[in-house]
From Swiss-Prot:
High-level lineage: Bacteria, Pseudomonadati, Pseudomonadota, Gammaproteobacteria, Enterobacterales
Entry keyword annotation includes Lyase: yes
Keyword Lyase in annotation: yes
Example GO molecular function: oligogalacturonide lyase activity
Enzymatic class: lyase
Gene from which the chain derives: ogl
Protein function: Involved in degradation of pectin, which causes soft-rod disease in plants.
Reaction catalysed by this enzyme: 4-(4-deoxy-alpha-D-galact-4-enuronosyl)-D-galacturonate = 2 5-dehydro-4-deoxy-D-glucuronate
GO process annotations (BP): pectin catabolic process
Location in or out of the cell: Periplasm
Superkingdom of the source species: Bacteria
Designated name of the protein: Oligogalacturonate lyase
The protein's Enzyme Commission number: 4.2.2.6
Amino acid sequence: MAKGKKLSFSFHTYQDSVTGTEVVRLTPPDVICHRNYFYQKCFSNDGSKLLFGGAFDGPWNYYLLDLKTQQATQLTEGTGDNTFGGFLSPDDDALYYVKNVRNLMRVDLNTLEETNIYQVPDDWVGYGTWVANSDCTKMVGIEIKKEDWKPLTDWKKFQEFYFTNPCCRLIRIDLKTGEATTILKENQWLGHPIYRPGDDNTVAFCHEGPHDLVDARMWFINEDGSNMRKVKEHAPGESCTHEFWVPNGSALAYVSYLKGSTNRFICSVDPVTLENRQLTEMPPCSHLMSNYDGTLMVGDGCNAPVDVKDDGGYKIENDPFLYVFNMKTGKHFQVAQHNTSWEVLEGDRQVTHPHPSFTPDDKHILFTSDVDGKPALYLAKVPDSVWQ
């Protein structure tokens, strides 16, 4: 199929069999569809349109779904789209994404014209999700030396890659000129680069790998490469995962858990003082994301983590629910079942992961699940009781 092609969907609405919550399946369950990474912008500012990845014609491409007309427009074509890392610009006029692990592209959403903003040098490979600053004038990303790179198509390869100590660099790209600057270069696996919202001088990144082997996952560094600092000293047996900025920039939030314990905790760190706080205990969720000011958080119940080396120390019962946490009252709510399989599909480790986040008005939760067949997108209504 070609860019600009329209697809008509028929949304399917049902009530969750346990909670009674209204859930809407947005995409057909016979075609692989998934949301982008949970902290990347996927909704238009008014909440009426949704960016997603879909495999309607073989390759995984980007589509923009009009939630009012139930019609999706194809935005990209061909093979090689990183359909997890892309995002909508702050003014909703463009899509940014990486193609063929090498080309940073901008798609004009009015004309669908594509511009190649930056090309990864031949001896490097673009890795993971690249994130823009609040004004969308620059972006941080990770590149891995081409000779060190291996496709991470399952969790065994993910674990093995950690021990290779690949040569990685954290880069900053000027989105107007395409000029790239190296912030940090290390012979260590780097990932998850994220500008602090509203503060271009602070960049978060992680030491990637099995969570029980990484001695200190989360780091801050100034945009010019100075003042690199450890976000948290891990306690013995502690893993810290799935860090993200609260969208107003007030804190970096993350999940913490200990080997041999089924308890998990929502934690945060002050980006200025580096004070770490344990906010609340939670059910065994994998991913977390907050609303704009961090007053609500949403998580996806999960099974024992697959991204650890010694999985015998992390056995938990599978939890198939989405949870909302009211961070003011300390209460949490079982919203609906996602019932996803968490399985690797077509060489992708994350396409069946729920990756929940809120709609712009905080009234619904977007998530991915393969409960009805292939991965599809869903919206679950946030219960009124959450605000009480």
